[in-house]
Amino acid sequence: MLKRLLKRPSLNLFSWLLLATFYISVCLNIAFFKQVLQVLPLDSLHNVLVFLSMPVVAFSVINIVLTLGSFLWLNRPLACLFILVGAAAQYFIMTYGIVIDRSMITNIIDTTPAESYALMTPRMLLTLGLSGVLAAIIACWIKIKPTTSRLRSVLFRGANILISVLLILLVAALFYKDYASLFRNNKELVKSRSEER
């Protein structure tokens, strides 16, 4: 019984990419989506569609990056990096209302150990442990089934990237003005997306 529970689950590359991409783009962007809801009223069908297109764009961007990384066997390290950074940034955004940007990362590097320990709370360790470390371990633990044909694998990944690019272009064609206005008037939103970090 225990042996069966500890057996590594296996997925094909496509399923693994979709699962990792979904977690990073949707689950680790909750802080971003909450901030968008504060400035984008869902009082019309158009605004609802604009809001619903945001996870699609985030999903497509992360999917492109992870799929490109899979050509060099970097999909797992990239996914782990995105998961850990996204979980940490989301925790700080939701807990302290701060946005992690490039200057904040510079400040983190300059932080003394005493300052770092002052920020560590049981809530932080639990949140980062579950949404970051555990999720990264699971992403690495899942066994990716080898593909039967190299050509088929390359074609699949190319199609995966193409579909993601087409989704981004479709959203841009339909909602470019809305995105431009929203992000121009609310610059802090750009920095709170996990794919910006």
Where are the regions a protein language model picked out?
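Conserved small/polar residues in nucleotide/adenosyl-binding loops
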Residues: 196-197
